[in-house]
UniProtKB/Swiss-Prot annotation:
Gene3D superfamilies: Catalase core domain. Its EC number is 1.11.-.-. The active site is at residue 54. GO terms for biological process: hydrogen peroxide catabolic process; indole alkaloid biosynthetic process; response to hydrogen peroxide. This is Catalase easC. Heme binds at residue 343. One of its GO terms (cellular component) is peroxisome.
Amino acid sequence: MAPNAADKCPVMNNTGEKCPVMSSSTQSRGPRDIYTLEALSHFNREKIPERAVHAKGTGAYGEFEVTADISDICNIDMLLGVGKKTQCVTRFSTTGLERGSSDGVRDLKGMAVKFFTEQGDWDWVSLNFPFFFIRDPAKFPDMIHSQRRDPQTNLLNPNMTWDFVTKNPEALHMTLLQHSDFGTMFTWRTLSSYVGHAFKWVMPDGSFKYVHFFLASDRGPNFTDGSTAKVDPNDPDFATKDLFEAIERGDYPSWTANVQVVDPKDAPKLGFNILDLTKHWNLGTYPKGLDTIPSRPFGKLTLNRNVKDYFSEVEKLAFSPSNLVPGVEPSEDPILQARMFAYPDAQRYRLGIDHLKAPLRRKETACQHDLGPEFEKWLSQVTSEAWSHPHEDDYKFAREYYEVLPEFRSQEFQDRMVENLCKSIAPGPEELRKRVYDTFELVSSELARRLREGAEAIVAEKARPDSPSRAQPGQLRL
């Protein structure tokens, strides 16, 4: 009986070719099963290096719709025309730890969006806080290392963080926020994200405005009442699961896009440097002595489709704040300038030199243009002191955040932040603890006193001979 068509149909094997698969592995003269060799070769190379930061993540597809006319301040094609829609892909992530870490770790959270515009890809690379630990890019490697695992024990060691913070007071503002409940209470669907940096939106005549834009979750602030997420503490992927299952059942999360605008002539009058990433553009909460920079809603982002293949559609995603479109330009912010180099450089290492040819990056229209508006002189110049030097604002913004918490949230919210700080400070050696107290004395005498009393009480409790938590050999070191 002649073989039928199904019998003749070749099998796709690991070489990528359609041909019958042989099972013999070796002959007298050595290996000859090229399919086994190819399968082993593929297995040895199927993983790629994880991201240097933001390694743990998840993603989904969606669309962005313009909801308000902002043509008076904007000449970006994607944002011109109420009702205009643009497809996009979004990746959420933790920041400091490795790919297998928990979604709920006390850490910054990232939300990166790649918009597939008619003029190329435009990336919004954002964090869940509108400011950062540092303003000098030279400090970035040390800052990240201070929040990772101890190189000797491979355990998290808060002493490394406090050693960095006490030597770099511009990090105090971010440190206080991270140790409040804002540092842990979230789901990806309720996360708001901020680009942090000042960008320039440039008009056809060459004039521009400094802008800061952000995405506010339509589900409201994360746990407004200060409660914690109702999740299984043993599930490190609770936020990832929550996002995926919500989209699968049609409960699509959405965010409102907002922009804050500063005329370059007004920038020197604001009382702080808008290019300093350790400070935020005041929305009216704090600092009370500085002008409010109101936000203006202009669009809505909705995520409505899960990925089919996590590795190719999320793990291989490549974002960069340098992926811009005509009408938007970077500011002189030193951290932004450094990120525009570091992100593509990291992708060349992680994904290879041809990462720009990945399917998610391909568009029917070219991504390189000569359409950008030009201008020859500054309308105003924002100048800065040496970025590495401490400044009174480093303490002022941290002080005002501490003082506004009972009004902004609740006294219990502030108390929990102090408790979290005390637990983090207490394992350190006496010399480091004293340095922490002295540093916070420059922020607030009341806060320094509460930290000293709380942390030293924990130290005394652990030193008791009958204490179950008494420090054992191999305790956290500096």
